[in-house]
């Protein structure tokens, strides 16, 4: 079974459920239970229907996502670059080493010596 494609494995599932000898799901105490039974074909149909619906939803989201424009055209990118170059930097330029900024810290805390 290692050489089968995933699609053929998926189609093999109902066959295995039907031929594999699975009995319908039944209650343990049949005498006083009015439960309905679920055949393997119905169970396989539910599972396959769920898988198909999940794949269809994923494909719909993928294709609808491709239809939405991203809004990053060439003209918009050029104006964005221009806006970035026009804005002023919020950072200060480095001014070299200044010893007077922290010189008073050593005199205030002598217990660190």
From Swiss-Prot:
A GO term for molecular function: signaling receptor binding
Gene: TYROBP
Described function: Adapter protein which non-covalently associates with activating receptors found on the surface of a variety of immune cells to mediate signaling and cell activation following ligand binding by the receptors. TYROBP is tyrosine-phosphorylated in the ITAM domain following ligand binding by the associated receptors which leads to activation of additional tyrosine kinases and subsequent cell activation. Also has an inhibitory role in some cells. Non-covalently associates with activating receptors of the CD300 family to mediate cell activation.
Protein's name according to its UniProt entry: TYRO protein tyrosine kinase-binding protein
Signal peptide start and end residues: 1-27
ITAM domain residues: 80-108
Record text on subunit structure and interactions: Homodimer; disulfide-linked. Homotrimer; disulfide-linked. Homotetramer; disulfide-linked. Homotrimers and homotetramers form when low levels of partner receptors are available and is competitive with assembly with interacting receptors. They may represent alternative oligomerization states or may be intermediates in the receptor assembly process. Binding of a metal cation aids in homooligomerization through coordination of the metal ion by the subunits of the oligomer. Interacts with TREM1. Interacts with TREM2. Interacts with CLECSF5. Interacts with CD300LB and CD300C2.
Extracellular membrane side: 28-40
Binding site for Ca(2+): 50
Site (Important for interaction with transmembrane receptors) location in chain: 54
UniProt similarity note: Belongs to the TYROBP family.
One GO cellular component term: plasma membrane
Cytoplasmic topological segments: 62-113
Biased composition (Polar residues): 87-113
Subcellular location: Cell membrane
One BP term from GO: apoptotic cell clearance
PTM remark: Following ligand binding by associated receptors, tyrosine phosphorylated in the ITAM domain which leads to activation of additional tyrosine kinases and subsequent cell activation.
Matches recorded under InterPro entries: Tyrobp
PANTHER family, alphabetized: TYRO PROTEIN TYROSINE KINASE-BINDING PROTEIN
Residue positions, PTM Phosphotyrosine: 91, 102
Topological category with respect to the lipid bilayer: Single-pass type I membrane protein
Biological source species: Macaca mulatta
Keywords: Calcium, Cell membrane, Disulfide bond, Immunity, Membrane, Metal-binding, Phosphoprotein, Signal, Transmembrane, Transmembrane helix
Region (Disordered): 75-113
Chain segments annotated as transmembrane: 41-61
């Amino acid at each position: 079974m290692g050489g089968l494609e995933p699609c053929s494995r998926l189609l093999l599932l109902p066959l295995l459920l039907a031929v594999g000898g699975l009995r319908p799901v039944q209650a343990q105490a049949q005498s006083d239970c009015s439960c309905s039974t679920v055949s393997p074909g119905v169970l396989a149909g539910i599972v396959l229907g769920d898988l198909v619906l999940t794949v269809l939803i994923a494909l719909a989201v993928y294709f609808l996502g491709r239809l939405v424009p991203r809004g990053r055209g060439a003209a918009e990118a050029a104006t964005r670059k221009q806006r970035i170059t026009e804005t002023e930097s919020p950072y200060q330029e480095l001014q070299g080493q200044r010893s007077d900024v922290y010189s008073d810290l050593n005199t205030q805390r002598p217990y660190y010596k």
